[in-house]
Amino acid sequence: MQKKTLSDITIQGKRILMRVDFNVPLNDEREITDDKRIVEALPSIRKILDNGGRLILMSHLGRPKGKVNPIFSLAPVAAKLSELIDTPVAMAEDCIGTEVMQSALALQDGEVMLLENLRFHPEEEANDPEFAKELAALGEMYVNDAFGTAHRAHASTEGITHFVPTAVAGYLIEKELMYLGKALEKPERPFVAILGGSKISGKIDVLENLFKKVDTVLIGGAMVFTFFKAMGLETGSSLVEDNKLELALSLLEQAKNRNIKLLLPQDVIAAPELSADAPFHAVSVKELEAGEMGLDIGPLTIEAYRQEILGARTILWNGPMGVFEIDSFANGTFAVAEAMALATAKGATTIIGGGDSAAAVAKAGLASKMTHISTGGGASLEFLEGKELPGIAALND
């Protein structure tokens, strides 16, 4: 997917309208608790400002449901960004309207303003053409650097591209496409995919698309129990999708037909209930008892998965191995993160597909040891499913 990027346009003296993903978590005092998404956008922001561009940033924050709600104002983000780039960031009162237009036209080279939350207007998520046209009028060129919303056809990601002469990808989207695209198109082999999470239903399309690309698939998380039940094993009170048993068998069959090594856990960590105080023990998947639930992969499985990871040249991970939020059931997820960090050090390309896996890697303190951590959970999942992302498809080739 070759798209024009920030490097292909002349920035000096131009009003550059850039869609970023500043949807950051805030606490009750409205302080930003994790500024990763702002930091991820800095390379594009700095490039535009250093080259004398006049930058207009736009983003959504939270789910204000199309109404103005001060709780979801981007003002704290403007303050944080200003601190990070050591430059004043003007905060607009709205994202469209005469006053906003006047402020945009008044920007000088190297100055930056942030528009107020796009989702204060229902037209944003409805991809309303009039709203998109009004946004487009603010800039002379459009840059999309919001990978996290690239799978949504919204006014600021897809609609806007119909009203601007130039629409290119920012550096973050370029980086996402480079790593995720290379993994799917020209991976160094062996290529191992690790899939976790609670439900097969959320990962069917990913599995079916990855079966065309990978050599080995390692499966963890509660979705293993749907496979086990389909295979006739006791699953106790573990989470099972009873309406997906046939599907589980067909996925196993597909893997076999394609000569893909698909590994399921040999043992799990079982407990009578999901709680931090519950007694737990490792048990073979063939010996799980009726009143028990499996909540993590066990030590034998960790070792087997570790060997596969360390023997790989490309590793893609999406979804935790267990309930890593509770220490008793976090070993599997952290062991996978550690094995991936080791594999990276040995020269493998390691890619984390956003969401819970990214949170787990951060919690393990290993984020800097991975080749690439995707910033978009839903967007990276759809990309891995082989779907076209509207926000990226709409950019200039």
Curated annotation (Swiss-Prot):
Cellular compartment(s):
Cytoplasm
As its record notes, the protein acts as a catalyst of:
(2R)-3-phosphoglycerate + ATP = (2R)-3-phospho-glyceroyl phosphate + ADP
- Per UniProt, substrate binds at D21, F22, N23, R37, H60, L61, G62, R63, R119, R152
Show the Gene3D superfamilies listed in the entry. Phosphoglycerate kinase, N-terminal domain
Looking up InterPro entries in the UniProt record yields:
Phosphoglycerate_kinase, Phosphoglycerate_kinase_N, Phosphoglycerate_kinase_sf
Indicate yes or no for the key word Kinase: yes
E.C. no: 2.7.2.3
**Keywords for this entry?**
ATP-binding, Cytoplasm, Glycolysis, Kinase, Nucleotide-binding, Transferase
Instruction: Look up the domain of life of the source.
Output: Bacteria
User: Which terms under GO biological process does the entry name?
Assistant: gluconeogenesis; glycolytic process
Which pathway does it operate in? Carbohydrate degradation; glycolysis; pyruvate from D-glyceraldehyde 3-phosphate: step 2/5
- Keyword ATP-binding included in the entry's annotation: yes
Top class in the EC scheme? transferase
Any GO CC annotation of this UniProt entry = cytosol
Provide a Gene Ontology MF annotation, just one. ATP binding
Could you tell me which CDD domains the record lists for this protein? Phosphoglycerate_kinase (cd00318)
Which residues take part in binding ATP? K203, G294, E325, G354, G355, D356, S357
Q: Which family does it belong to?
A: Belongs to the phosphoglycerate kinase family.
Which HAMAP family does this one have? Phosphoglyc_kinase
Q: How does it assemble?
A: Monomer.
Protein name in UniProt: Phosphoglycerate kinase
